[in-house]
A protein has these predicted regions:
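Non-catalytic terminal extensions that flank enzyme cores
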Residues: 1-20, 38, 43, 147-148, ...
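N-terminal Rossmann-like or analogous alpha/beta NTP/dinucleotide-binding catalytic cores
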Residues: 2-123, 127, 218-219, 223-236
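Noncatalytic linker/hinge segments flanking ATPase motor cores
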Residues: 22, 85-90, 151-153, 199-204, ...
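Sparse recognition of residues in long alpha-helices and their boundaries
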Residues: 48, 79, 243, 267-268
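Active-site neighborhoods of enzyme catalytic cores
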Residues: 58-60, 64, 68-176, 183, ...
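Alpha-helix boundary recognition
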Residues: 101-105, 207, 268, 281
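Active-site cores that bind ATP or allylic diphosphates and position pyrophosphate for catalysis
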Residues: 117-256, 263-267, 316-319
Length: 319
């Protein structure tokens, strides 16, 4: 049998399996799925388990079961496999090393010996995702200074960025500009223990998996300028981005995996899959009432124009 034409639109789920999914994860997954499917697109499931100790495989397996239960089916990746293996970031170190060495050969990578406490003590500005804008403390170290510091501590490695504005149009949030040096700062490519950093890993993986659109939470909006810079340096095609508003608890707190009541494990005991999908669709402006819906039934009317731009407080009693 001949394979059908490959869709030009490829979206992705890219969860970090450090615990059970919560409503915020589910909302982002639903929007990513609807955005790709509304264009007849495909979905890739990639497991972002860079920190393998915090992300046991049992959570990844449970995550797949949860997504399937909700009706958010994917076309390749995870345990299903496919043409772009591996789909688990913990298995991709060799792939990341190739790109890392390219950046190193450009003279843009340098060792950093700063501790987290030192960075916070420096009173440097913070990015919108809570990270400290690196003040460049180790950028100009001499070879002798580096050798001396290595005797006491293994370094992490950062990418040197220019004083340059990066502007892009976000599918949900509209036009956004960040200055690489002032708003982001030189950022980590590799931790001191050898684990590659999120920014490099997602760029390499999205490119090699043919991802054309990235839908994720607004807390990652500030990562986009850094990633676009990496795409350019590595000569890789950049996807389009859409950052969806975060789902907050009714008291305004950001939902996390510590919010047990809003974990899918507990929600599945109280609601059907259609109940959960329909209520999330209502919260995100995709329907006028919290009626039960399947993901499939929401595709034809999906539009980013309906999705709010500001974070969403979960209406009292919705879940």
């Amino acid at each position: 049998m001949e394979a059908g034409p490959v869709s030009a639109v490829v979206g992705r789920f890219a969860p970090s399996p450090s615990g059970r999914l919560h409503l915020g994860n589910l909302a982002c997954s639903l929007l990513a799925w609807l955005s790709a499917r509304s264009w007849g697109g495909r979905i890739v499931l990639r497991i972002e388990d860079l920190d393998a100790e915090r992300c046991p495989r049992k959570y990844a397996d449970q995550l797949e079961e949860d997504l399937g239960w909700l009706g958010l089916f994917w076309d390749e990746g995870g345990s299903k496999g496919g043409p772009h293996e591996p789909y688990y970031q913990s298995e991709c170190s060799g792939i990341y090393t190739e790109s890392y060495k390219k950046l190193e050969a450009m003279g843009l990578v340098y060792p950093c010996f700063c501790s987290r406490s030192q960075l916070h003590a420096a009173s440097a500005p913070h990015t919108s995702d809570g990270n400290v804008v690196y003040p460049g403390t180790c950028r100009g170290l001499t070879a002798e200074e580096i050798a001396e510091k290595r005797k006491k501590k293994a370094p992490a490695y950062r990418l040197m960025v220019p004083d340059e504005n990066i502007t892009f149009t976000d599918g949900c949030m509209g036009e956004h500009t960040e200055n690489l040096l002032r708003d982001c700062g030189d950022f980590y490519l590799r931790r001191a223990d050898g684990v590659f950093a999120y920014q490099l890993a997602v760029v390499v993986d999205d490119a090699r998996m043919g991802v054309t659109e990235v839908v994720r939470g607004a807390d990652l909006l500030s990562s986009t300028a850094r990633q676009l810079y990496l795409y350019r340096l590595l000569g890789l095609p950049a996807p389009k981005f859409a950052h969806c508003p975060l789902l907050l608890a009714s008291d305004g707190r950001r939902l996390s995996k510590r919010d047990g009541d809003q974990s899918l494990e507990n929600l599945r005991a109280r609601y059907t899959a259609e109940d959960i999908v329909g209520r999330l669709a209502y919260a995100y402006g995709l329907q006028e009432e919290p009626a039960p819906r399947t993901p499939e039934s929401l595709i034809k009317d999906f539009s980013w124009d309906k999705v709010p731009k500001k974070d969403i407080c979960l209406p009292e009693g919705l879940f």
